[in-house]
Amino acid sequence: MTNIRKTHPLLKIINHSFIDLPAPSNISSWWNFGSLLGICLMIQILTGLFLAMHYTSDTMTAFSSVTHICRDVNYGWLIRYMHANGASMFFICLFLHVGRGMYYGSYTFMETWNIGVILLFAVMSTAFMGYVLPWGQMSFWGATVITNLLSAIPYIGTTLVEWIWGGFSVDKATLTRFFAFHFILPFIITALVIVHLLFLHETGSNNPTGLNSDADKIPFHPYYTIKDILGVLMMVSFLMTLVLSFPDLLGDPDNYMPANPLNIPPHIKPEWYFLFAYAILRSIPNKLGGVLALILSILILALLPFLHTSKQRSLMFRPITQTLYWILVANLLVLTWIGGQPVEHPFIIIGQLASISYFSIILILMPISGIIEDKMLKWNL
């Protein structure tokens, strides 16, 4: 008798995606982050659903409703902090997932990569809108500053900002629509994730060597299901340590003060996972230039397939580009640090140098090093 998982129309899809999927035998733990992101998305949707049951998207009651969730709802504090810190875990996994793709040349799967870039934008916009919902000081001023950036668009900018606000400032209409979008976007993200996987399964997974692995494939289950479960346990342990012992470690104390349009916080800054982009935005004195640099800092990922000059796919056997890659990682950490610092000397110049380095490494140095490494392979020493 044929196994039902191979014949049933629905189970067949699951079987081909997670059970009998042929996977390279040599993929390392860097390939765990896809499944971890799936778990993060599930955690966020579930905790978010329960939060939405008690939250009110009105400027008068939003802050109080979050306080009510933490104080009066059964395990409300746990749900709220799992959602807030779950977002941080989501971005940690996202950055590592993208970093893995850059290191091992996974961006040569064009469709999968481009859907991934769209997903990154969708997750970032969802997180930004979610940060506005508690209606604390940093929520209000963060929303004001970031939405105001659209006013840099020539001719239609001011009208566009007022249209997004639903008035002449960030107010009740803004909060209501941000809640609506914050609720719907994770489901759009889920649909995009399915498309992302669909394109990935058309080509099969990449592997650390970047070489064709068709001759050496193993079934996804049980080998990689067990491996993924280990990753999930480690991530959930880390998340719960964060939630139960250091729930406010990654948050901003200013957000425990209700939003006050008459009182500007001394340092307006976004959540830690946006700081690198925020530093790039601030490093350019011109408003429109800053906005373009901000968008390009993420959109540059879509250019990676066109900037690949080497005959080798992965960085595994490319020492010069490897060095540049790790300099880029260090550079991103510097940008993250600068994004959280006040706009004063010496932070301004450090931010500007780090921003120039970021674009130079990706657009100029890495493609050149790829060409040099190819030439080095032809040397007969």
UniProtKB/Swiss-Prot annotation:
Binding site for a ubiquinone: H201
Binding positions (heme b b562): H83, H182
Cofactor note: Binds 2 heme b groups non-covalently.
Cofactor(s) of this protein: heme b
Assigned keywords, A-Z: Electron transport, Heme, Iron, Membrane, Metal-binding, Mitochondrion, Mitochondrion inner membrane, Respiratory chain, Transmembrane, Transmembrane helix, Transport, Ubiquinone
Principal cellular location given in the protein's record: mitochondrion
Membrane-topology descriptor: Multi-pass membrane protein
Entry's transmembrane regions: 33-53, 77-98, 113-133, 178-198, 226-246, 288-308, 320-340, 347-367
GO cellular component assignments: mitochondrial inner membrane; respiratory chain complex III
Binding site for heme b b566: H97, H196
GO molecular function terms listed in the Swiss-Prot or TrEMBL record: metal ion binding; ubiquinol-cytochrome-c reductase activity
Location(s) in or outside the cell: Mitochondrion inner membrane
GO process terms (BP): mitochondrial electron transport, ubiquinol to cytochrome c
Source organism superkingdom: Eukaryota
Known function: Component of the ubiquinol-cytochrome c reductase complex (complex III or cytochrome b-c1 complex) that is part of the mitochondrial respiratory chain. The b-c1 complex mediates electron transfer from ubiquinol to cytochrome c. Contributes to the generation of a proton gradient across the mitochondrial membrane that is then used for ATP synthesis.
Note: Heme 1 (or BL or b562) is low-potential and absorbs at about 562 nm, and heme 2 (or BH or b566) is high-potential and absorbs at about 566 nm.
Family classification: Belongs to the cytochrome b family.
Record's subunit section: The cytochrome bc1 complex contains 11 subunits: 3 respiratory subunits (MT-CYB, CYC1 and UQCRFS1), 2 core proteins (UQCRC1 and UQCRC2) and 6 low-molecular weight proteins (UQCRH/QCR6, UQCRB/QCR7, UQCRQ/QCR8, UQCR10/QCR9, UQCR11/QCR10 and a cleavage product of UQCRFS1). This cytochrome bc1 complex then forms a dimer.
Stated name of the protein: Cytochrome b
Natural source organism: Apodemus sylvaticus
